[in-house]
Amino acid sequence: MISGVFVSYRSAALAARAIATFREEARLAGREAEAIAVVNSGDAAEREALVPHADRVLLPPRNLGFAGGLNAGIAAARGGTFVLANPDLLFCRGSVAALAGAAEAGGLLAAGPALYADGARSVLLPPAEEARPEELARRALAADPARTARVFRREARRAAAQAERAAAGESAFVRGLSGAVVAVTRAALEAVGPFDEGYSLYYEENDWQRRLLVLGGRLVYAGGAHVVHLFAQSTRREPRSAAWFAESEARYYETHFGEAGKRGLARLASCAPFEAPPLPVAGGLSWVDPAPAAVAISPFRHFRPFALALVPHGESRWTPPADLVAAHAGETLFVRAFARASGATLAEARFAG
């Protein structure tokens, strides 16, 4: 049996859709499945809204955080394989089969999918980075206007490689997976241990994945598993999110990297706010260079991290998908068209949702 564990926080409608697509994909794969929903809001109405959709709905007496919610759901589940998930997901055709197959391939493994920001799967979310002090250094470089272009070119190469894997349905061993959805067997969970509930929100997946890697386990990017992630639909409305992120980040780096982690955090904190010329507001991008192009989409002016849209050959125009715009209503997104071969900027703008 495959157990889907969905941790919901003021996201009942999203979680219901996620559960429905998970169930359908498990059915098409010929796999027995169950869905466990953990309602972290403490809202009995949210629990009742999910009762028709999940096999079990847990309503803890307090907010357990994402880590605690996963642990509670895992403890209540019966499956030998788990899909541990955010509520703001849509499982695409073949995704549950591909994730389960990758997680069950033998050995100490965890698997994650190709994540898209839109239903048409034209905008690929960024590759996960292994959270190490070197990653803090890259974030500091990205915040430096004199060095940000070099960091962007590296990210563009990684994103393009991931897009090609996803398009071809290819899998690869990686050093980090998004925590939005991870597939893992019960045996692997028992070997690595539960998620650390000291993380209120954020970095719980990095901590768990690092423990798996230290034990000799491997992380699999399952390019044949495509999942739409509407991204931060509950946390972006939570005023404590920024504080939780800072607390979890400090805890993770200091726990796993000691003084090197502290130095990396201090360097990042000392960076001046990123400054660059303002971009014009536009509803799309156009450019004249005929070279193969891609578009980066980011909430940050320095474009780190960014989602990637590959522009079809021969086209020199791009408009954001309507569902991406709707998911980020009220936010500003920065967009950059760039030459895929060189990373050179072709056009830039900002979208004010």
PLM regions: where:
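Short, flexible, basic/aromatic active-site loop/helix in glycosyltransferases
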Residues: 130-174
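Conserved donor NDP-sugar-binding/catalytic core segment of glycosyltransferases
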Residues: 90-127
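Short aromatic/hydrophobic "clamp" motif used to bind/position activated sugar donors
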Residues: 82
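A short, conserved alpha-helix in the catalytic core of glycosyltransferases
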Residues: 165-169, 175-193, 197-225
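Acidic donor-binding segment of Leloir-type glycosyltransferases
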Residues: 22-62
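Active-site-adjacent helix/loop segment of glycosyltransferases
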Residues: 209-282
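Short, well-formed alpha-helical segments that are part of the catalytic scaffolds
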Residues: 11-26
